[in-house]
């Protein structure tokens, strides 16, 4: 749990099929992908092909990254693939006659924090929508969709009426003094909710984004479920917008863990996803009309569970790359210009390159969970690069200096490679990947033998053990190194050695973007 004082796949939304050398047929809400228009950076290059050769390194890491979601599942487990996990949290929600047994434990503890869990679902949806063909090429699409549905099943139950959303199961004050397996929990699991008297705009809007994006994922395979998700998304967005108020102001207890710095970004993010899911121009007008109020145009930001602006700007850029009819939405250009500024900040040789970078090349912003910005930045860079290439735009200008779209992809790969072991420490930060990775991950279930029965306190003998975790939390992306590229592998070091589901969702998106090659990128080398 975070304490805060602390495509190159061309499937998903757009499956590019080369029929003639100069013709692209793509499925983007039944509209053809557009080619270069006057004023674009540069165009006329080769067009993308279907997934190509598989990069085993990223394919292996992707399989592991998705496995971490199985490790984090609450509820009655179905087709359980993790031998040291079992059913848990079966009575969650019962005090209000709800079934909140599903969902994911947020990190190494056993709280279900709705705000970052919804963000996890939104990012997983985005990853599937853009890179579903990549995932499918390495047999990981079904596991990704299964994990997403485990979350959205929970979110549906957590929204029992239009203006009520349960946003947390468990109390950190009760949970955190314990060290035990989730299967053995006997402590009370109190519920926290938002409603008209206690609004929480950011968590309601993020949950709306999660449900709207997931409705697209399941639109073809389960249209009834998709329609249910979309109905909830619309209700939650209306609740978020009409009953504005910060959840971390109205519920001060959350401030120590997932404190929000504002809700404007979530409103824009949710409206953007609802437009993609519905093509209802009302939502497009919303992001256009509220851009000056909430979007911080011209000021690049870091994409995270707390700040969705950079993600929103990239997502809305997608419309300008591919959508034909966007009449009356003049404000979208500001979103794409700011997205470009974000990209220019990430390119190492750009005149506006960020200084928030280690000597080894890792994007580094904060000591706590340092890799969140690394993986989120790399994911957005992959997306933007792929949007450019699919649109036959292969250059971007950063203060007059020209960079290729493939250089954004190279940046994304550099971050992924660092996480997988190409770094000064020679260690992988993805548990189970490579020959050297963290052995003492701050994770209760991983640290306690599956056949041990512990209470709240006696489990600390496993926390204090000098032996490595008896269970391997396969696929977990831990917090990451300090700026000086030091890392302490210890259970007592959650700042660096605790994994989170939202980091793993971003990692899944990043690895899915890199898992195969295509004719386009090969031809641009």
Swiss-Prot record:
Catalytic positions are 109, 442, 489, 498
One GO MF annotation is: cellulase activity
> Where does the signal sequence lie?
1-26
Question: Gene Ontology cellular component?
Answer: extracellular region; mitochondrion; plasma membrane
EC assignment: 3.2.1.4
Alphabetically ordered keywords of this record: Carbohydrate metabolism, Cell wall biogenesis/degradation, Cellulose degradation, Glycoprotein, Glycosidase, Hydrolase, Polysaccharide degradation, Secreted, Signal
Name its GO BP terms in alphabetical order: cell wall organization; cellulose catabolic process
Domain of life (superkingdom):
Eukaryota
Q: Which reaction does it catalyse?
A: Endohydrolysis of (1->4)-beta-D-glucosidic linkages in cellulose, lichenin and cereal beta-D-glucans
Q: Which residues are glycosylated?
A: 259, 464, 484
| Protein location | Secreted
Q: What family does the entry list?
A: Belongs to the glycosyl hydrolase 9 (cellulase E) family.
What protein name is recorded for this chain? Answer: Endoglucanase 10
* Species of provenance: Arabidopsis thaliana
